[in-house]
Every structure is written in C-alpha cells, then in structure tokens.
Amino acid sequence: LECHNQQSSQPPTTKTCSGETNCYKKWWSDHRGTIIERGCGCPKVKPGVNLNCCRTDRCNN
C-alpha cells in the first residue's frame, strides 16, 4: 500500500506501508489554521480531530 505522508499543504510525498491495509488523513484547527497529517494505518484520534481512513493507494491526499 502506498500512502501520502506530507503535512498540511506541503508538496505531495508518499511512503510505502508494508503490512498496512489503511492510509489515513486527520485534520484539526488551531491558532495556525487547519493542520493536516497523513500517513499509514488508521489511528485513534482525540475528540475534535477529524479522521478519514481509506484502503487504496494514495487515497489520503
């Protein structure tokens, strides 16, 4: 599985995720604006953090 792993609005970069079945994108807002984090897996998130998990290559941009 290949997942995007760039932060927020950085240029897209990807990572090969051995043994993973999900990519994730999570986002939240703070004083800097909207922060977006991407990577492999499907993490648990705190209340107030939005999470989207998906199962295809580069699906989490």
Curated annotation (Swiss-Prot):
Pfam families according to UniProt: Toxin_cobra-type
Tissue specificity annotation: Expressed by the venom gland.
GO cellular component: extracellular region
CDD domains in alphabetical order: TFP_snake_toxin
Disulfide bonds listed in the record: 3-23, 17-40, 42-53, 54-59
Entry-linked InterPro entries: Snake_3FTx (IPR003571), Snake_toxin-like_sf (IPR045860), Snake_toxin_con_site (IPR018354), Toxin_cobra-type (IPR054131)
Keywords: Acetylcholine receptor inhibiting toxin, Disulfide bond, Ion channel impairing toxin, Neurotoxin, Postsynaptic neurotoxin, Secreted, Toxin
Main location: secreted
Compartments it resides in: Secreted
Note: Negative results: does not inhibit GABA(A) channel composed of alpha-1-beta-3-gamma-2 (GABRA1-GABRB3-GABRG2) subunits.
Function per UniProt: Binds to muscle nicotinic acetylcholine receptor (nAChR) and inhibit acetylcholine from binding to the receptor, thereby impairing neuromuscular transmission.
Protein name: Short neurotoxin 1
Organism: Naja oxiana (Central Asian cobra)
